[in-house]
């Protein structure tokens, strides 16, 4: 009788989960720096405010979170700190939380106290860290407060705001803009809305770095902080739908993808010397135009999405092993080369996070993948819809495709992963997706 009672209790719990409404909530908070923090990391002021955005999802059995922070990258120690805040405020375990950098190139770096590079101003670093922590707390609390029954839908559009940044020069491959190079124009959108149709959150996934203002300074000197392309597009979407909507940008496989135009463009002179030509503050006009165009593409796609009220959540984590190579910030590429000797360095562990939202799969990895690798994963996925997201739960430099190694590109030479690692990782990730799909069908 006891066994029968336990079985009935299990059935009742399962029925409760099935009957529990799918809920979602999202929050946004601006990162506020004190005026006396400047100058910092070469930045002398702010052009636009950085932000933290949090999305919470709950199917009655699992609660998951996606946090997008306007930073270039996030260290392991800071990831752990951010996840503890999400656990404290939103009751989301570290396992079920994805902390993503928006990958804006126009933001100062934040380091945990035990990971600060030599020469770092500890007091200012602490002030930066606290500003982001306060914003995360505010965004997470806003997401908790906003939780309500919701529906989810996926759509895919197209945007043309990116370009392949690997260009061939007489001296070898270097950075720039190559219209003939491979790019992935697919724009993946997850729309979450309340029962009355009010958009709660728009999640956008696109393969482009937020680097319109990368390396650009004011005409009078000094850089300006900006959320760059991801932030401008997110603000456009939020302004379009209203104050109750939060737009989260998940950077795709953008290791070799740049905004179509940049304020400080790369040049190689007749002698093979590299440099940049900067149009200074005028670059923010480019940022506005590209951000608005991407935002318009997002809205156009989101408005055509059909919604589904039944959504099952699941998070799965794994570690895959791929071949590595010697890499150090001290020997980062400084220009094009005609040849290069890669140094094998054993194997490297690569964390992979999979998040299932009904028939949508989110693949999260740390390294910046080449766009072709992102497309390979999406095409091989058994799910109806797949998003490939980089800069998730930390960063690990570049994971370039095999062709990049043959060309000695910036990404291939600035990578801890050996030639073939990206293709191997893609195959293993597809295997993980197949296992996740079969376990739940």
What does each of the following model-derived ranges do?
Residues 1-13:
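N-terminal export signals
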């Amino acid at each position: 009788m006891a066994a029968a009672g336990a079985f009935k209790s299990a059935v009742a719990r399962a029925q409760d989960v099935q009957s529990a409404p799918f809920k979602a909530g999202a929050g946004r908070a601006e990162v506020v720096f004190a005026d006396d923090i400047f100058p910092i990391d070469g930045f002398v002021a702010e052009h636009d405010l950085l932000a933290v955005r949090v999305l919470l999802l709950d199917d009655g059995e699992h609660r998951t979170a996606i946090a997008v922070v306007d930073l270039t990258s996030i260290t392991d120690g800071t990831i752990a700190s951010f996840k503890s805040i999400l656990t404290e405020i939103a009751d989301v375990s570290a396992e079920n939380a994805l902390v993503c950098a928006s990958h804006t190139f126009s933001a100062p770096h934040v380091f945990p106290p035990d990971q600060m590079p030599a020469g770092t101003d500890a007091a200012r670093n602490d002030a930066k860290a606290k500003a982001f922590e306060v914003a995360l707390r505010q965004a997470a609390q806003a997401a908790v407060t906003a939780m309500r029954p919701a529906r989810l839908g996926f759509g895919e559009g197209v945007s043309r705001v990116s370009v392949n940044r690997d260009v061939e020069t007489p001296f070898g491959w270097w950075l720039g803009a190559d219209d003939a190079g491979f790019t992935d124009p697919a724009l993946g959108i997850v729309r979450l809305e309340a029962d009355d149709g009010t958009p709660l959150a728009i999640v956008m996934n696109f393969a482009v770095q937020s680097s319109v203002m990368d390396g650009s300074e004011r005409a009078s000197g000094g850089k300006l902080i900006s959320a760059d392309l991801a932030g401008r597009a997110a603000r456009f979407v939020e302004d379009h739908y209203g104050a109750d909507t939060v737009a989260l940008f998940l950077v795709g496989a953008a290791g070799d993808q740049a905004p179509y135009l940049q304020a400080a463009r790369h040049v190689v002179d007749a002698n093979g010397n590299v440099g940049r030509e900067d149009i200074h503050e005028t670059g923010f006009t480019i940022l506005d135009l590209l951000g608005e165009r991407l935002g318009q593409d997002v809205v156009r796609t989101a408005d055509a999405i059909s919604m589904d009220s039944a959504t099952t959540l699941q998070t799965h984590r794994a570690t895959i092993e791929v071949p590595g190579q010697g890499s150090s910030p001290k020997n980062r590429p400084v220009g094009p080369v005609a040849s290069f000797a890669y140094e094998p360095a054993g194997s490297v562990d690569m964390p992979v996070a999979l998040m299932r939202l009904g028939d949508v799969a989110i693949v999260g990895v740390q390294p910046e993948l080449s766009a072709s690798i992102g497309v390979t994963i999406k095409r091989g996925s058994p799910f109806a819809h797949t998003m490939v997201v980089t800069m998730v739960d930390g960063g690990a430099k570049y994971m370039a495709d095999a062709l990049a190694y043959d060309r000695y590109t910036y990404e291939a030479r600035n990578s801890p992963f050996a030639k073939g690692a990206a293709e191997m990782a893609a195959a293993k990730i597809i295997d993980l997706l197949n296992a996740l799909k079969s376990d739940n069908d």
